Amino acid sequence: MPLLDSFKVDHTRMHAPAVRVAKTMTTPKGDTITVFDLRFCVPNKEILPGKGIHTLEHLFAGFMRDHLNGNGVEIIDISPMGCRTGFYMSLIGTPSEQQVADAWLASMQDVLNVKDQSKIPELNEYQCGTYQMHSLAEAQQIAQNVLARKVAVNKNEELTLDEGLLNA
């Protein structure tokens, strides 16, 4: 099985919260797709709580679109990482890491402005596979943590995993 790009970076050197360009590709029609690693937690030291990450998934997707879409950028998807340390965001376009960081911070402020759980989008059995597994309080704690710590940039050239550590 091929080694995926996300496993070729040294997770022991990642900063969090931080944004990283995980991958770029060009479609046959010439569009650039950029995948961002939005790292909320320091790998192997912190983890996002299950209910909080799920609620954040519902809120973050819309708020990031509000702040980042436009001027040649359109978000395709924002999905939580299986390791629960962040999200991957795929989009059409090439916004800078700073543009993404600014949109992320604005989105976290939006999360704090949600007044109660009934305001979480798609929070029903028809639109959500585990609609009872949510916590606005946990999502807001995650947002507060990001806002308090700010968002750095993780550079791929600083995170390249030493060949000797691959499959160690």
UniProtKB/Swiss-Prot annotation:
Binding residues for Fe cation: 54, 58, 128
InterPro entries: LuxS_sf (IPR037005), Metalloenz_LuxS/M16 (IPR011249), S-ribosylhomocysteinase (IPR003815)
Keyword set includes Membrane: no
Catalysed reactions, semicolon-separated: S-(5-deoxy-D-ribos-5-yl)-L-homocysteine = (S)-4,5-dihydroxypentane-2,3-dione + L-homocysteine
Protein known as: S-ribosylhomocysteine lyase
Cofactor(s) demanded: Fe cation
Cellular component aspect of the GO annotation: cytosol
Keyword Lyase listed: yes
UniProt-listed PANTHER family: S-RIBOSYLHOMOCYSTEINE LYASE
Top-rank lineage group of the source organism: Bacteria
GO MF assignments: iron ion binding; S-ribosylhomocysteine lyase activity
One GO term (biological process): L-methionine salvage from S-adenosylmethionine
Organism in which the protein naturally occurs: Neisseria meningitidis serogroup B (strain ATCC BAA-335 / MC58)
